[in-house]
Curated annotation (Swiss-Prot):
[4Fe-4S] cluster 1 binds at residues 25, 71, 74, 77. This is Probable cytosolic Fe-S cluster assembly factor oxy-4. Pfam families: Fe_hyd_lg_C. It comes from Caenorhabditis elegans. Belongs to the NARF family. [4Fe-4S] cluster 2 binds at residues 176, 232, 380, 384. The gene is oxy-4. Disruption phenotype: Arrest at the L2-L3 stage in 90% oxygen. The lineage of its organism: Eukaryota, Metazoa, Ecdysozoa, Nematoda, Chromadorea. Keywords: 4Fe-4S, Iron, Iron-sulfur, Metal-binding. Component of the cytosolic iron-sulfur (Fe/S) protein assembly machinery. Required for maturation of extramitochondrial Fe/S proteins. GO terms for cellular component: cytosolic [4Fe-4S] assembly targeting complex. GO terms for biological process: iron-sulfur cluster assembly. Transmembrane segments: none annotated.
Length: 457
């Protein structure tokens, strides 16, 4: 991996027990997994010519062209080929999209902001302004916080759990694309029926921008460019899913995903690491302008979305109280119960981060020993704060030290609950599209071929 030829910031390297993507694509030369779309960027994989000159006349193959859609349909590796991720979704695509669109919007995750803040020694306020200034100088109209989209997800998760029969539990979070790919390709029949149907914040943000904002501004979705800055390379893969295209079109709701490290490299390259003067946009709505003013929204429950904590909160509110107890099983596993005064367990949720812990969970589920109601799952040890696209450091000690700082910065983010703005957008969206709620959910399906035999643990 270290000799891949890619910039150091775009490698998924040495993230503890995280399973890195396979560099050797196994899609056969003769077959196509997914029909290619003309507009998709492509990566050429050339094959060596046979030694036998005579046979080469009949056996020589054309270049194989692999897209992210191919990766999603193939079970050759857990996530995807790094080459494809980098070549298809890069800053070149961002510049092109901004130039060719009538409206450009960038969604930025608070995890990315805190990672950059730790790296350059600035506050999250300052970093938010730097990022907004950088993109607006490129021609982006709106730079928004993904926390606004996460609010839609939070409003739905307890309702989803409440309607999930106890026999179908645990309900598994779906915000981590690495885990979703693992579930689809390795344990489809067991895990897919239990995965939450609620979209991730990135996917919801794409729906808001292409499904709501575009309509409100009188634009076609194809005239709007939406990029996202995320802590995870697999978010690039998520954006390429067929489910996350504007209904009835080939237009992606999120056109391009850039990792935290890729963004910082580009900001430094353009010598734009200071917050510049951004024109006064006080007339803009709060959710469209807050990030540009340095406002970043955090959440109770840590940097991985706070889904488990939100369920506990809503359960306690609905049931008039309860005794909440949290146990740390290891540094990447947490269990929380809500008990009655008599000691009866009324609700049990868990946080499970890192593939080793995920595998232990799967083993328990196979033997029906897992009694948890809801599990917040992240593929990376440490969760989203330690995503594969975050700023990486040379030694493991330095990585752990910086991760603690990133988590602390996230914990210190204000819990601004702009309920009024959120309700206003939701109501306005419903007026434009009475079926808007459908855009907050998705479906997953197993990938038929099993890859257990090719995994190297």
């Amino acid at each position: 991996m270290e000799d891949s030829g890619f910039s150091g910031v775009v490698r998924l390297s040495n993230v503890s027990d995280f399973i890195a993507p396979n560099l050797d694509c196994i899609i056969p030369l003769e077959t196509r997994t997914v029909e290619k779309k003309k507009e998709e960027s492509q990566v050429n994989i050339r094959t060596k010519k046979p030694k036998d000159k005579e046979s080469s006349k009949t056996e020589e193959k054309k270049s194989v062209k692999i897209s992210l859609a191919d990766c999603l349909a193939c079970s050759g590796c857990i996530t995807s080929a790094e080459t494809v991720l980098v070549e298809e979704q890069s800053f070149g695509r961002v510049y092109e999209g901004i130039q060719n669109s009538k409206l450009s919007v960038v969604t930025v995750s608070p995890q990315a902001i805190t990672s950059i803040a730790v790296k350059i020694g600035k506050s999250t306020n300052e970093v938010a302004k730097i990022i907004a200034s950088f993109f607006r100088r490129l021609g982006v109209k709106y730079v928004i916080d993904s926390s606004f989209a996460r609010k839609f997800a939070h409003s739905l998760i307890y309702e989803e759990l409440s309607t999930t029969p106890s026999t179908s539990r645990p309900l598994l979070s779906s915000a981590c694309p690495g885990f979703v790919c693992y579930a689809e390709k390795s344990h489809g029949e067991l895990l897919i029926p239990k995965i939450s149907k609620i979209r991730s914040p990135q996917a919801i943000s794409g729906a808001i921008i292409k499904g709501f904002l575009a309509k409100r501004e009188g634009l076609s979705p194809c005239d709007v460019f939406h990029a996202a800055v995320m802590p995870c390379f697999d978010k690039k893969l998520e954006a390429s899913r067929e489910q996350f295209k504007v209904d009835g079109t080939d237009v992606r709701e999120t056109d391009c995903v850039i990792s935290t490290a890729e963004l910082l490299e580009e900001i430094i390259k353009l010598e734009n690491d200071e917050a510049g003067d951004v024109e006064n946009r006080s007339e803009e709505e709060q959710w469209l302008s807050a990030l540009s003013k340095g406002s970043v929204i955090g959440d109770d429950g840590g940097a991985s979305g706070g889904y488990a904590d939100r369920i506990v909160r809503d359960f306690v509110l609905e049931n008039g109280g309860g005794i909440v107890k949290t146990s740390k099983l290891n540094k990447n596993m947490f269990s929380t119960t809500v008990e009655s005064e008599a000691g009866e367990i009324l609700l049990r949720v868990a946080k499970v981060y890192g593939f080793r812990n995920v595998q232990n969970l799967v083993r328990k589920m196979k033997t029906k020993k897992e009694k948890t109601d809801y599990v917040e799952i992240m593929a990376c040890p440490g969760g989203c704060a330690n995503g594969g696209g975050q700023i990486r450091y040379e030694t493991m000690d330095e990585r752990e030290e910086k991760l603690i700082k990133v988590e602390a910065l996230y914990e210190d983010l204000p819990r601004q609950d702009d309920e009024e703005t959120w309700i206003k957008v939701r109501e306005e969206w419903e007026k434009l599209d009475k079926n808007y709620r459908n855009l907050l959910f998705t479906d997953y399906r197993p990938v038929e071929t099993n890859v257990a035999q090719v995994l190297k643990w």
